[in-house]
Amino acid sequence: MGKYNLILSEYLSFVYNSQSAVQIPIYYSSNSELETRCIEFHAKCVDNSKKGLSLKPLFEEYKDVTDNATLLSILSYSYDKYNAVERKLVSYAKGKPLEADLTANELDYENNKITSELFQSAEEYTDSLMDPAILTSLSSNLNAVMFWLERHSNDIADANKIYKRRLDLFTIVASTINKYGVPRHNEKYRYEYEVMKDKPYYLVTWANSSIEMLMSVFSHEDYLIAKELIVLSYSNRSTLAKLVSSPMSILVALIDINGTFITNEELELEFSDKYVKAIVPDQTFDELQEMINNMKKIGLVDIPRMIQEWLIDCSLEKFTLMSKIYSWSFHVGFRKQKMIDAALDQLKTEYTKDVDDEMYNEYTMLIRDEIVKMLEIPVKHDDHLLRDSELAGLLSMSSASNGESRQIKFGRKTIFSTKKNMHVMDDIAHGKYTPGVIPPVNVDKPIPLGRRDVPGRRTRIIFILPYEYFIAQHAVVEKMLLYAKHTREYAEFYSQSNQLLSYGDVTRFLSSNSMVLYTDVSQWDSSQHNTQPFRKGIIMGLDMLSNMTNDPKVVQALNLYKQTQINLMDSYVQIPDGNVIKKNQYGAVASGEKQTKAANSIANLALIKTVLSRIANKYSFITKIIRVSGDDNYAVLQFNTDLTKQMIQDVSNDVRYIYFRMNAKVKALVSTVGIEIAKRYLAGGKIFFRAGINLLNNEKRGQSTQWDQAAILYSNYIVNKLRGFETDREFILTKIIQMTSVAITGSLRLFPSERVLTTNSTFKVFDSEDFIIEYGTTDDEVYIQRAFMSLSSQKSGIADEIASSQTFKNYVSKLSDQLLVSKNVIVSKGIAVTEKAKLNSYAPIYLEKRRAQISALLTMLQKPVSFKSNKNTINEILRDIKPFFVTTEDNLPIQYRKFMPTLPDNVQYVIQCIGSRTYQIEDSGSKSSISKLISKYSVYKPSIEELYKVISLREQEIQLYLVSLGVPLVDASAYVASRIYSQDKYKILESYVYNLLSINYGCYQLFDFNSPDLEKLIRIPFKGKIPAVTFILHLYAKLEIINYAIKNRAWISVFCNYPKSEMIKLWKKMWSITALRSPYTSANFFQD
């Protein structure tokens, strides 16, 4: 068995190293005779350990079990409440503890003072500014590091260098923590006043970040970067990450492009050997020098030195070090400010009357025209989504907070909740539901605030608006996004696009006479000057649209939307400041509306168009592309002569002056070769991503359990690794060991084995081989998968009680009645299930389900019972196929050039052989005709699971399903009678299988699955027309080949002679595949 189990048993003997500690392995087998031996073996182990006898003779006696059965879990038993961490830590605490500079940050509480100096008493204390918000403790993290160090203390050669580097860095951490003692966490993994009062306030979050950084050290450069960040982030909790990552916006403009990929007319990336020289005016170098000086000012030495050394020849080869520094800077942890400072930051902007009114006017008009353009067609055609906008809003209502806690009665049960969906049900039940009235958010009813924390930026505030705002905006915004989907300017929403094509989009037009202007407008989006022109533009657009229709329902939808904008122009917010809640007038735009993303994009587009129209008064150029992506916008301008330093200098200064005329505090840059925006950056014709996901600190506490967080940790590790920031895998596995263990009693713990955590069951947490998703097909794997299926869905008493209450039932039937023309059990049941699922975000229900699941899991981890079901898993389908596959060694030449330098070697190799994918594989079923037919007449959106179920029904039932959703009978019967229906059957099955095989996640999303190079390695004789079977055989063959290539950097070809007699059987089986949701899949989804 794999490396995980080895690390597991070593880790257990490392942590529980006393005489009294016992570890009992538990095995299982799908073979009933061997299973009996497994049970005997376990019983005797328990017996021996009770008598204090050695387990060694049993391992001899039961060699058949240890050789042939599968390890299920390890039961660990230890008397001593261990303060082992402190004891072990002392031997590493040989260095000088760090001393915090208590004047390093502007805001007093951001200095790393002793907690009792920041908070005089337990009442005043809050951990919200330093809460790691992750369900694992500092002591576990220290244990994991010391375990790694102990395991590798005898490494030789290069491995020994890594050991020494990490040991040296850990000495700093250990010495500092040892000075104050290891802070003990409570059962919720929080650090209370009593524990923290005599320790530096930021000790825990700093130590977590430092551990994450030191366990990501491999080379000498890593060591220098990490050391500097670890030492300085102990004092500087505010600006360090920002200062370290600032230079990147200029560095991208310094490298010549020598060969790059461009997007061609067919929306594919193709190589172009063009050469573009980086033309850099002196002023740019001055700005860069100033950034470097600012870095030196706060005590950085090595990082600015590395940047300066790179500047000598600005080579692309050595640029990876620059991108490394850029990624590392985020790992110092989140900057968490007090809400009052986060809010006042946006209120402090001085408002000047001296602005260019003409430009503001143009800006407002552009917003107005864009809104009209986006909504014109749906409004003129009286689109059903706009007519039923309220219903559409209710169906997609989230279970997020509604801003206030309320007492709600469900039948006999009374609960307190802040959730939107529960408030809606409550209001409907009491006749207080008035979607036609948008509640004011003025001084009488100020908006409660949420927060968003990011490394290297200030904390931002989020409006928590009443649900009426969501209902009013939902349908209209959906229509706006639909327009954005086929408008290239909106890089985020553009349907055919992805990060790679957007990259080829820019490089396509770069040449000696083109410059690219890129601006970060995040400050502008939340500035006060933006709010009046912004909201007014939207309001004017909506007024124009109202005159284009006579349908009262559409007019009503537009009017409600307009009302949200009017209300928000006079908005007040509640800001907690200590124990008081302050009311402040808030003039800026904040996230929290449904329209945030769409409206910001529209405004950014209007802004850059306004700027370009001013520049055009002075220069003659053609605008080749304009793109907006979130807070960033960029444009490529083509001039009729070659560019000179002076031209770039002039354009740059003019652009800045224009922004200044609008009092927009933005960072505008001009370059000839590269850009840097929040999501990605382009340098030397290659594309880079920032690998800045924190592993051991989280932004906020959600209601995910330790298992979920272990899966998220692994998923974050994978994303960072693909982007060029690698953390030691053994360390990650050790964290998974810690976070997935289940306590039975104080001294008894159960540790699941690799098989449990990597089989795709409801408990999957990670992959045994990075980047490769395995679908186990052996008897033992399928057996354990079936065993876990039985305990996937747990009941919750509270949820059942709520669901059986009149309040809940009335709400569900209200939705069904509004949605359906005639009875439709599938949809009504679907709505009820969806609404019941929304209840999961209510903590008591979640906890109840989780407890039930953990206790079932405990039973299962000690003795699995396989479970009979008529559902198949994808594993069983693949198990039927596998025996007919014959593989032989083969080879593929490297034929594509690198364009993403940060990728790990094995992934890079596969892409260079088969090419990269520039399209999303459709895995939602939305391209099928039935899905399009439904969306033409109804606001209801069936999930891929529902479509999969419906499309396999009898034709009569499908027709009834369609008619009940408002599809006219003639369309429905025409659909069932046509050939399209059988094509749909195939399309939906295809989407469903893609969805199950996570083809759009991890590194699979980078590979071209339709690559002709890949196809030629597969030989499957064609036998009769069952396209679905042909499809799954091909897909499985491709996965086998790609997985083999990732693992071995070598290629195989696959021959499959699938018997015709088996094909029908397989085809029937393919219509009863069940989807498995696990912490692993939700972590993948969460990455999205």
Swiss-Prot record:
<dbReference type="GO" id="GO:0000166">
    <property type="term" value="F:nucleotide binding"/>
</dbReference>
<dbReference type="InterPro" id="IPR022071">
    <property type="entry name" value="Rotavirus_VP1_C"/>
</dbReference>
<keyword id="KW-0808">Transferase</keyword>
<keyword id="KW-0694">RNA-binding</keyword>
<dbReference type="GO" id="GO:0019079">
    <property type="term" value="P:viral genome replication"/>
</dbReference>
<keyword id="KW-0547">Nucleotide-binding</keyword>
<keyword id="KW-0460">Magnesium</keyword>
<protein>
    <recommendedName>
        <fullName>RNA-directed RNA polymerase</fullName>
        <ecNumber>2.7.7.48</ecNumber>
    </recommendedName>
</protein>
<dbReference type="InterPro" id="IPR001795">
    <property type="entry name" value="RNA-dir_pol_luteovirus"/>
</dbReference>
<dbReference type="GO" id="GO:0006351">
    <property type="term" value="P:DNA-templated transcription"/>
</dbReference>
<keyword id="KW-0693">Viral RNA replication</keyword>
<keyword id="KW-0696">RNA-directed RNA polymerase</keyword>
<comment type="similarity">
    <text>Belongs to the reoviridae RNA-directed RNA polymerase family.</text>
</comment>
<dbReference type="InterPro" id="IPR042032">
    <property type="entry name" value="RNA-dir_pol_4-hel_dom"/>
</dbReference>
<dbReference type="Pfam" id="PF12289">
    <property type="entry name" value="Rotavirus_VP1"/>
</dbReference>
<dbReference type="InterPro" id="IPR007097">
    <property type="entry name" value="RNA-dir_pol_reovirus"/>
</dbReference>
<dbReference type="InterPro" id="IPR043502">
    <property type="entry name" value="DNA/RNA_pol_sf"/>
</dbReference>
<comment type="function">
    <text>RNA-directed RNA polymerase that is involved in both transcription and genome replication. Together with VP3 capping enzyme, forms an enzyme complex positioned near the channels situated at each of the five-fold vertices of the core. Following infection, the outermost layer of the virus is lost, leaving a double-layered particle (DLP) made up of the core and VP6 shell. VP1 then catalyzes the transcription of fully conservative plus-strand genomic RNAs that are extruded through the DLP's channels into the cytoplasm where they function as mRNAs for translation of viral proteins.</text>
</comment>
<keyword id="KW-0548">Nucleotidyltransferase</keyword>
<dbReference type="Pfam" id="PF02123">
    <property type="entry name" value="RdRP_4"/>
</dbReference>
<keyword id="KW-0946">Virion</keyword>
<dbReference type="GO" id="GO:0044423">
    <property type="term" value="C:virion component"/>
</dbReference>
<feature type="domain" description="RdRp catalytic">
    <location>
        <begin position="501"/>
        <end position="687"/>
    </location>
</feature>
<dbReference type="GO" id="GO:0003723">
    <property type="term" value="F:RNA binding"/>
</dbReference>
<comment type="subunit">
    <text>Interacts with VP3 (Potential). Interacts with VP2; this interaction activates VP1. Interacts with NSP5; this interaction is probably necessary for the formation of functional virus factories. Interacts with NSP2; this interaction is weak.</text>
</comment>
<dbReference type="GO" id="GO:0003968">
    <property type="term" value="F:RNA-directed RNA polymerase activity"/>
</dbReference>
